[in-house]
């Protein structure tokens, strides 16, 4: 019987050994695979990574990434699937920066993305935006998570509530609310109403001062709306918000100020050109020019099919009406050594009349409906009216007087003339000089 007992013991030991080996094999299969060693230049890597910072109880920034890796012995983090929120100090809004890949230097609070970057400004923390938000696309973007400022030197495109734009390079400071478009700037400002003309803004560089509602164009800028152009140096474009009949609000360009400026309105059968050392142009809510003020070496030329009228003075104020979404010259006030020259233009079947030159300290010109021809010219100070001959039979004449009122018929022909204290001088023609005809002088009260 002893051998039977030995056989049973051996069988039991063998069974235990087999069970142990099977269990060991099963446990070994369940052990997780040993992670791969990190590259020698990395400290760590991870999925779904984030970092955030608060300042005085308010969120400062929140940076998340689908993946990240940290360079060994460095504060540099290489990120992919990146989302950066830069919160306003008031805590009511934030700017959002997204990119496929970026680098963040934690010690420097510096975020940089070499590739394509999408930026959305001033997203409200609660509720829907009151208007379309500013959206920016660029590359090579650097952000500072302490100051929340952004900067790039690469081509940049913008989409905003009233249009689009592009520039080479841009920067934005949410603390001062200043947006800079660095060079080769163009904005296309779309009208709010169907049928109205868009306005194109061009500049060497642009600075948008949001808190002042001003756009600075430096060192030069140009605004074009249909056939209307205003350009100059150190332009300041002022915008303001208007409320529509339905209660909706929109932002419009209402004023442009510039130095060494010039402009033009060119339409079929009429044109206006002007220049001055300093110009202020006012627009209505549809973008139509309504008033232009020129100071210092001010000059205006209004041209119709029959006449070119030139106004020169130290100061010129022009008032415009609006017709069919176009500006129409209605009135000109010239002060400080004003000179108004009306010169007839050649036309088939019509002889040229004299050129009229009016000089006074203050001259007012009122235009006929449609802005092509003069209706009335008034001097609000003593003046001199000179007639320059354009035909051999015409006389050179001068007339001095006070409170002159000159009424014009169509095609800028003098219809009536009134003055007080008149003194005239009429010079003989060349033919009359051959007959020794003398100068004629007259005077009247």
Task: Annotate the PLM regions.
Residues 1-445:
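Mature-chain termini and adjacent capping regions
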């Amino acid at each position: 019987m002893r051998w039977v007992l030995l056989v049973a013991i051996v069988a039991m030991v063998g069974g235990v050994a087999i069970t142990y080996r099977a269990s060991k094999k099963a446990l070994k299969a369940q052990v997780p695979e040993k992670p791969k060693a990190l590259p020698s230049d990395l400290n760590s890597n991870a999925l779904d990574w984030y970092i955030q910072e608060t300042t005085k109880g308010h969120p400062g920034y929140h940076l998340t990434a689908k993946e990240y890796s940290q360079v060994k012995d460095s504060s540099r983090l290489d990120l992919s699937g990146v989302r950066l929120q830069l919160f306003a100090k008031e805590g009511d809004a934030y700017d959002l920066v997204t990119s496929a890949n970026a680098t963040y230097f934690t010690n420097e609070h510096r975020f940089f993305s070499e590739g394509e970057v999408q930026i959305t400004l001033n997203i409200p923390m609660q509720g829907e935006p009151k208007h379309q938000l500013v959206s920016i696309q660029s590359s090579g973007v650097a952000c500072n998570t302490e100051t929340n400022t952004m900067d790039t030197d690469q081509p940049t495109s913008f989409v905003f509530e009233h249009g689009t734009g592009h520039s080479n390079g841009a920067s934005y400071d949410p603390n001062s609310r200043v947006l800079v478009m660095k060079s080769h700037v163009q904005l296309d400002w779309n009208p709010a109403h169907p049928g109205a003309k868009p306005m194109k803004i061009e500049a060497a560089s642009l600075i948008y001062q949001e808190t002042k509602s001003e756009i600075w164009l430096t060192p030069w800028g140009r605004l074009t709306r249909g056939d209307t152009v205003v350009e100059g140096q150190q332009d300041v474009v002022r915008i303001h918000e208007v409320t529509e009949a339905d209660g909706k609000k929109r932002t419009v360009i209402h004023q442009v100020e510039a130095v060494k400026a010039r402009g033009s309105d060119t339409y079929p059968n009429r044109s206006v050109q002007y220049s001055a050392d300093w110009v202020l142009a006012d627009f209505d809510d549809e973008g139509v020019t309504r008033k232009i003020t020129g100071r210092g070496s001010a000059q205006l030329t209004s041209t119709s099919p029959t006449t070119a009228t030139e106004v020169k003075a130290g100061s010129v104020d022009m008032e415009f009406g609006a017709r069919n979404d176009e500006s129409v010259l209605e009135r000109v006030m010239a002060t400080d050594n004003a000179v108004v020259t009306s010169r007839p233009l050649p036309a088939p079947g019509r002889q040229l009349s004299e050129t009229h030159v009016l000089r006074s300290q203050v001259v007012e010109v009122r235009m006929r409906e449609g802005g092509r021809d003069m209706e009335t010219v008034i001097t609000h100070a003593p003046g001199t009216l000179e007639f320059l001959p354009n035909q051999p039979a015409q006389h050179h004449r001068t007339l001095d007087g006070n409170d002159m009122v000159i009424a014009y018929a169509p095609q800028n022909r003098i219809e009536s003339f009134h003055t007080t204290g008149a003194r005239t001088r009429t010079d003989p023609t060349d033919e009359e000089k051959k007959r020794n005809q003398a100068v004629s002088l007259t005077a009247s009260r």
